[in-house]
Amino acid sequence: PSASLPKHYPIAFNLIPQIDVFLDNLYTKEEMKMINETRKIMHDDEMRITATTVRVPVYRSHSESVNIEFEHDLELKDMAAAINAFPGIQMMDDPSNQIYPMPLYTSEKYDCFVGRLRRDESNPNTFNLWVVGDQIRKGAALNTLQIAEVMIKNGWLEK
């Protein structure tokens, strides 16, 4: 997890639920970075969000299990259509045929891939989804550019 830590576990055939060092709140530095960056991107310092980061043995591509709660209920098909219509995102969602995003097949691509879209059985107005994206190809620079393009197109930002 970190060169400064005394224990080092094998990564092959293993998952390590720690990236970086633990903080006083028992989250790791990487988890707090995800939380704080998401709040910053969303311009909402009060956004309720949590994260668990796990070191996994993949060549590349970050993967996230995301849980989103909305103020009002949505139909699953409308949620899927909204995701699919967004530039830079591709739905890859046919679980009955074992089609869903995986790092092995989404690495070295510029888009992010979404699958396993479903209602959260534990909370109304809430959906779960699985997102995979190549952090090298779809990093901060490309993502920022694409967000700015959408903002300009929608009149949310002037040229």
Predicted regions and their residues:
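Active-site-lining helix/loop region of Rossmann-like oxidoreductase modules
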Residues: P1-A82
